[in-house]
Amino acid sequence: MPSNKAGIIPRLCLRSAFPSFPVSPLNERPMSSALRPSACPGLLRIVQALDGGICRIKLNGGSITAVQADIVASAAERFASGVIEATNRANLQIRGIGSTHGPLIDSLMASGLGPTTAAGDDVRNLMLSPGAGIDRTMLFDTRPLAERILDTLQGNARFHDLSAKFAVQLDGGESLAMLEHPHDLWLSAFEQDGEKRWAFGLAGCPTDTSAGSVALNDGHALVVAVLDMFLEVARPEQTRMRHLLAEHSREILLNRLAERLSIQAMTDWRRTLDSRPLHIGAHPQAEAGVVYVGAVPPLGRLDPVMLRGAAQLAARFGDGTLRFTPWQSLLLPTVRNEDAAEVIRSLERMGLFCDPDQSLTRMIACTGSSGCSKSLAETKGDALQMAALLKRHGQVLNVHLSGCSRSCAAAHIAPVTLLAVAPGHYDLYFRDAAQPGFGALHARHLTIEAVAALLDARSRSPLDA
């Protein structure tokens, strides 16, 4: 079963955590000796894989300036293989890094993309909607609160004891939101009797039943209270909220929280999921006359030319920023209506997809056996073959190819999952809420051709539910 991923949050440099303009660089890199052992890559911790080192660049709110994006592209060219990945937590990764890490790290730190302390890099994981502050249906602009949370956690060494996988989600009610990634704590804005509040839950998603609600002004206090409670109650081996809930009832934990701030019981609310592919193509923003343009790199991978080109478009036609998304894609915000078509044409010429009817926009695949020793198949290549076969059949399906059971490329359960069992062969699962893990096992040891034929036949069957 896919593991719940990521850690928690502090703040970046002496600047806004959500920049829309070039930033001042840090004067020096945090001391690497303060890094704790972890298998998770970071900006300061380069983790080795079969294809070289991996550097994970955590983006506050998924946002990066055009200047910073150009620096990332140059770093990938100069110090690595040129492979840049958009992750399912709206971050970036550089792959194929050589044995000398210092110049790459220094260039990224100087751009303002790193933490202020080495310990802070592991725990700055706060996921927002890619449409934060610009979505037409948002109830609350989450960016100021997110920046405040990042400030607090970066400045409080106590929160650096959280696992590097501990995760928080802040949902402002946007239509463009990934609501299927489990988090240790989630907050979701809603309106009740004319009052805006935060619904929240522990170890789950906003589409789950909420645990309670707090006043809109208490969002920051709630996050701090939950993290304090977790660190007080959890034993060292209990690194995630789900571990705590396996031993303590939700009611007990909520009672402890109620000692710290006013919580209203609420177990009959859950967030409605908008299943439209709003991260692809041009969509109106809250501000009249402008749109954001969403583009998907093939299987989440960009090369330096793609990233640099998108950054140049953002500087010329947008607000000078790019926003990365949990769908391993990117947005160019604040493009004038009359410029959207030209931006889309330019992105497509670079090799990005802006049409949700293209098969590769719905495909997810991990690194595969060429880059990961745990993968049993070359998932990227197999995904390209699958997309071509589905296109031939006129099918556009959400399919996840995983080289092993860890499901690194997807934090949620896809409608269709192919789990590698040997090179070019997969077990086929269909999502089923009643089944654990990837869902219901439908067939074993299938080739890509066999999977495509089966999916095509299934889509045409009148008996298919």
Question: What positions do the PLM features span?
Answer:
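Intrinsic, low-complexity N-terminal interaction/targeting segments
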Residues: 33-48, 114-116
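Flexible, glycine/charged-enriched surface loops at secondary-structure junctions
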Residues: 82-86, 159-163, 231-255, 260-277, ...
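Mobile "lid/hinge" segments at catalytic clefts and subdomain interfaces of large enzymes
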Residues: 162, 166-247, 412, 417-465
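Active-site cores of enzymes that catalyze phosphoryl transfer or operate on phosphate-rich substrates
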Residues: 271-292
